[in-house]
Regions:
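Short alpha-helical transmembrane segments in multi-pass integral membrane proteins
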Residues: 1-37, 94-161, 207-262, 320-385, ...
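Transmembrane helical elements of multi-pass membrane transporters/channels
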Residues: 35-54, 155, 189, 222-226, ...
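Hydrophobic/aromatic residues within transmembrane alpha-helices of membrane transport systems
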Residues: 42, 54-58, 69, 94-99, ...
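Helix-terminus/linker motif at the lipid-water interface of multi-pass membrane proteins
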Residues: 45, 49-67, 136-143, 201-210, ...
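Small-residue hotspots at the loop-to-helix junctions and early N-terminal turns
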Residues: 63-74, 149, 153, 216, ...
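Small-residue-rich hydrophobic transmembrane alpha-helices
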Residues: 66-126, 163-182, 294-358, 389-411
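Hydrophobic transmembrane alpha-helices of multi-pass small-molecule transporters
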Residues: 78-81, 193-198, 227-231, 304-307, ...
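Short runs within selected transmembrane alpha-helices of multi-pass transporters and secretion channels
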Residues: 87, 156-174, 182-190, 215-230, ...
Length: 467
């Protein structure tokens, strides 16, 4: 019996990684979650490794370099917000069309999403490249940090298009049920970046490398390769999504529908990432460069464990979209509740790791005693609310996948801007908590978001949304 289950388990893993497109409107729900979640978890896990490897190599360049990466990543989350918002809209629309068996409209929707993304990417790139100094100054960077890091910031903003397309096209493939192809594109991007990082930063055989700018260039090259792989498979036409040149003719009905879903989804993450920018600034103002460095190391580790959990959340989004398209509402809800259970279990294990192993985790990235102290403190406090975070992220993504992107936006606004930021400011400035106050505001807000999102999801408004 045990041997049979082991064989079945590895057979499912092989099937999940093969890259076949599945009809998730029928069959065992646990199997459907597994087939979708495994490649999504592996996809985002390697993205997490990529973020940590980046911080490991950059960390050897000193406090200023760590701070620059932290400041820039905080600002780049605005681009991530746009990318994830467009990706969320694409996943919801394409999953619904696939559930309805309308693959031609699914392909046209994918092409329209690519056009919309191109316009926004150009605008973000121009703004970031021109105003890199001012953006770093706004984040609270010192004169020395700005001088050392402005080129890094320019390069990262200049590559906005590859960031947006990498996320968007993966959302398209996930909506079509091909999570494995999305995984492979991010693997390509991450592996190339990991190989190029030390070469471009430190050099080789007498070449001194590009230092901090080398880290940015390695990231751009890696992501560019991932996008090239995605585009190849989109135009190859062997799967559900078969994009033709005629699909790029503007279809204003689809564009309107896409934007109606994308702008709330984008603002969800703008609201969330904007609050993180304010929190980053608050930490810098309260504790200086050492506090910023410790906090950024902690956040990179938080991201390392949160991104795999997003794999389960994204699986819920695809399942709810396809099953609503097939008019199987009960199956859609059961899929979400099962994914929520699995995510809560996973995040409870992560919480234990952060509480008991934070010291060796942070020490791996730096030898600075003060940076380690602050990083450990941040990891332990922020990690204490991870069970609720796991529940909340599935609820929010499920509503997004159903096409109800406005409700999670309102929840995010209340949780982050009416609770987290005011609470963090009060605790750091007036309560005597100091830096700890900024850290405690995070799990408190995330717990509130999870409770509210769960309650609203169970009310069932998402069942009536048309996309």
């Amino acid at each position: 019996m045990v041997a049979t289950n082991i064989v079945k388990f590895f057979s499912l893993i092989k099937e999940a990684l093969r890259g076949d497109e599945h009809d998730y409107t029928q069959g065992n729900i646990r199997t459907a979650i597994f087939l979708l979640a495994i490649p999504m978890i592996l996809e985002l896990s390697l993205e997490s490794v990529f973020a940590l490897v980046d911080m490991f190599f950059v960390g050897k360049l000193g406090q200023n370099a760590i701070a620059v990466v932290g400041y820039t990543e905080s600002m780049i989350t605005i681009i991530y917000s746009l990318a994830i918002g467009l990706s969320t809209a694409a996943t919801a629309i394409i999953a619904r069309r696939v559930g309805e068996k309308d693959t031609e409209d699914a392909s046209t929707s994918a092409a329209q999403a690519l056009m919309i993304s191109g316009v926004f990417s150009v605008v973000l790139s121009v703004v970031g490249v021109i105003y890199s100094d001012e953006l770093l100054r706004f984040m609270g960077a010192s004169v020395d940090v700005i001088a050392e890091g402005k080129s890094f910031t320019r390069i990262m903003f200049g590559s906005s298009a590859v960031i947006v397309y990498l996320f968007l096209i993966n959302g398209i493939f996930r909506g079509a049920g091909n999570a494995a192809l999305a995984m492979k594109s991010l693997w390509i991007a991450s592996i190339i970046n990991i190989i190029l990082d030390p070469l471009f930063i430190y050099g080789l055989y007498g070449w001194e490398g590009w230092g901090l700018e080398g880290a940015a260039i390695a990231t751009c090259v890696g992501r560019g390769a991932g996008v090239a792989y995605q585009v190849f498979h989109m135009v190859k036409g062997s799967g559900i999504i078969k994009i033709k040149l005629s699909d790029f003719t503007p279809d204003w009905k689809i564009i309107k529908s896409m934007l109606q879903l994308a702008w709330p989804a984008t603002f969800q993450f703008v609201i969330a990432s904007g609050s993180w920018i304010v929190l980053t600034r608050l930490v810098a103002d309260t504790g200086g460069t050492a506090a910023s460095a410790g906090y950024q190391i902690a956040i990179r580790n938080v991201v390392f464990f949160i991104l795999p959990a997003w794999g389960l959340s994204n699986a819920a989004a695809t399942l709810i979209g396809q099953n609503l398209g097939a008019n199987q509402v009960d199956r859609a809800e059961k899929s979400v509740m099962l994914a929520t259970k699995y995510n809560a279990i996973f995040m409870s294990m992560v919480m234990a790791i952060f509480i008991f192993l934070s010291q060796p985790i942070v020490s791996f990235f730096t030898n600075d005693a003060e940076v380690i102290r602050i990083g450990v403190q941040a990891l332990q406090i922020i990690g204490s609310g991870f069970i609720f975070y796991g529940i909340g992220m599935v609820m929010m993504q499920a509503m997004n996948g159903a096409g109800d992107t406005k409700t999670p936006t309102v929840i995010n606004f209340v949780g982050f801007w009416l609770v987290q930021i005011p609470l963090a400011y009060f605790l750091t400035q007036y309560s005597g908590f100091g830096l700890e106050g900024a850290f405690w505001a995070v799990p408190i807000a995330e717990t509130l978001i999870a409770v509210v999102a769960y309650y609203i999801f169970k009310q069932g408004r998402w069942k009536t949304i048309k996309v």
